[in-house]
Structures are given as C-alpha cells and as structure tokens.
C-alpha cells in the first residue's frame, strides 16, 4: 500500500454483482467503467468494493462483521454505500439456505443434475415464488449493519439503494417482490435519514429497452454512469463534498 493510498479516504461499498458486472460479464474491482470506481474517482478517494454475485442485505451484514477487508477500510472510510437489495426482491423457488447448498452436492454428476433441474424449475415457478428475503428481514439486516458501522464510526455518511429492474428469462421476467422490498428499505431509510438511490430510475431505460447485459439483469456502461451520478448526488445530500467539482 502506497503512502498516498494510506492518506486518502476510502469509499466503502458493499454490493451484489450489479456493481461490477458490465454488458458482457464480471469485471475486476479496479475497472474504471463500473460505477463504484466512477464515484471514487470523482471524489478523489480510494475504493474498497466488497461484494459477490447473489448477495442480499443479509450477506452485507455478514461481510461487515466478518470480512477483515471491511474492518481495515472502515477506519479511513469517508462514506459507506449499501448497494444491495435487488437480490432480496427477486423470486426464489427454494429457500436461500437450500439453494446455496446446491454447490456442495456430491458427487459432481448429482450436483449437475440438481443444478439443471433448478434451472428448469426456476423460470417456470418464479412468477408465483416468494422474494428471496422477506422485506422486513431486508430492513432488519440493513439496520443491524448500519448500527454496527455507526457504533465504530459515529456519524459516518451512509447511502443505501432501492432495487433495480430486470427482464431476465431465468426469473421468468418476474419481479413482484420489488414493491415490498422498496417499501421496507424506504421506511428504514427515512427513519434514519439515510439518502437513497433508486437504481430503477437510473437503469430502467437501458434494461427495459434491451441494451444491458444479455442476461437481462446486469447493465451496460451507460447505466453504470447513470448510477454513479445518482450516487454522487446522494453522497452530497449526506454531506460528502464532490472534490473535483469543488476544485
């Protein structure tokens, strides 16, 4: 770590794969085209991006309390962004705990058989399936994480986000759980004066027009830029100055 890196604030982002996937797939955390790096560059900060495909707000709680990267980044963080909630709201044919156990099925032929079966069932049952995480649990995990971060860094600016939209065939294009998740996150954020970024407002035009990733979920770089602009506005609302604009 360079001395310059040690002196600069860090933007600590907890995210699902929407933060680091582009129009053709996943990208390294230092790719300048993804929104976390656009935001960090505009602030002249370092970026600590902690995330994984499929993460919900429950995973953010686990990461914030168990991942040593989060422990190292928090003391010098200038702000924290919770960029999850989308997976919480997507339909899940199986309970999350069971679905995540598929990767551990042995032998390998049986695991492939189970995965293929789940891939067949998911788009067909998604229109009637429950959300992956009940909305009240989404809000509870956000609050637990906020409380833990605020305990260690009282008053640090925190931003949260509302779920994106999708047209993914793998989910039968179903997203009936979004409204409940939006309501729960909004109520929690209002109670704690947390600025919100509505990812739908930033990316809907690109996604619903078919200009995102072919999977129907992830975004193109125009959408990443639009998200970055809304994140910067939310950070300004939380009291974080835009360094380059001030300069």
Swiss-Prot record:
Gene Ontology biological process terms in this record: protein tetramerization
UniProt entry tagged with the keyword Transferase: yes
SUPFAM superfamilies named among the record's database cross-references: SGNH hydrolase (SSF52266)
Keyword Acyltransferase: yes
Keywords, sorted A to Z: Acyltransferase, Transferase
Reaction catalyzed: (2R)-2-O-[alpha-D-glucopyranosyl-(1->6)-alpha-D-glucopyranosyl]-glycerate + octanoyl-CoA = (2R)-2-O-[6-O-octanoyl-alpha-D-glucopyranosyl-(1->6)-alpha-D-glucopyranosyl]-glycerate + CoA
Record-listed E.C. numbers: 2.3.1.273
GO cellular component terms, semicolon-separated: plasma membrane
Single GO MF descriptor: diglucosylglycerate octanoyltransferase activity
CDD domains linked to this entry: SGNH_hydrolase
Function: Sugar octanoyltransferase likely involved in the biosynthesis of mycobacterial methylglucose lipopolysaccharide (MGLP). Catalyzes the transfer of an octanoyl group from octanoyl-CoA to the C6 OH of the second glucose in diglucosylglycerate (DGG). DGG is the preferred acceptor, but to a lesser extent, GG (glucosylglycerate) can also be used as substrate. DGG and GG are the two earliest intermediates in MGLP biosynthesis.
Similarity comment text for this entry: Belongs to the OctT acyltransferase family.
Known partners and oligomeric status: Homotetramer.
Protein name: Diglucosylglycerate octanoyltransferase
Underlying gene: octT
């Amino acid at each position: 770590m360079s001395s310059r890196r040690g002196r600069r604030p860090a933007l600590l982002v907890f995210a699902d794969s929407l933060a680091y996937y582009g129009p053709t797939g996943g990208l390294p955390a230092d790719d300048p085209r993804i929104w976390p790096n656009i935001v960090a560059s505009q602030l002249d900060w370092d970026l600590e991006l902690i995330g994984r495909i499929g993460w919900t707000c429950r995973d953010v709680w686990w990461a914030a309390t168990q991942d040593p990267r989060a422990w190292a980044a928090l003391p010098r963080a200038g702000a924290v962004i919770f960029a999850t909630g989308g997976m919480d709201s997507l339909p899940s044919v199986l309970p999350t705990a069971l679905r995540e156990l598929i990767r551990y099925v042995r032998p390998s032929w049986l695991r492939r058989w189970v995965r293929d079966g789940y891939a067949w069932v998911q788009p067909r049952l998604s229109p009637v399936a429950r959300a992956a995480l009940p909305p009240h649990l989404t809000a509870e995990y956000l609050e637990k994480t906020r409380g833990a971060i605020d305990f260690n860094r009282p008053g640090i600016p925190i931003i949260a986000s509302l779920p994106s939209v999708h047209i993914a065939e793998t989910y039968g294009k179903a997203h009936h759980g979004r409204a409940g998740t939006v309501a729960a996150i909004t109520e929690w954020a209002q109670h704690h004066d947390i600025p919100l970024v509505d990812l739908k407002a930033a990316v809907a035009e690109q996604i619903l027009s078919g200009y995102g990733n072919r999977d129907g979920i992830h975004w193109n770089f125009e959408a990443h830029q639009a998200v970055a602009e809304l994140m910067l506005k939310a950070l300004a609302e939380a009291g974080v100055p835009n360094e380059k604009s001030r300069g």
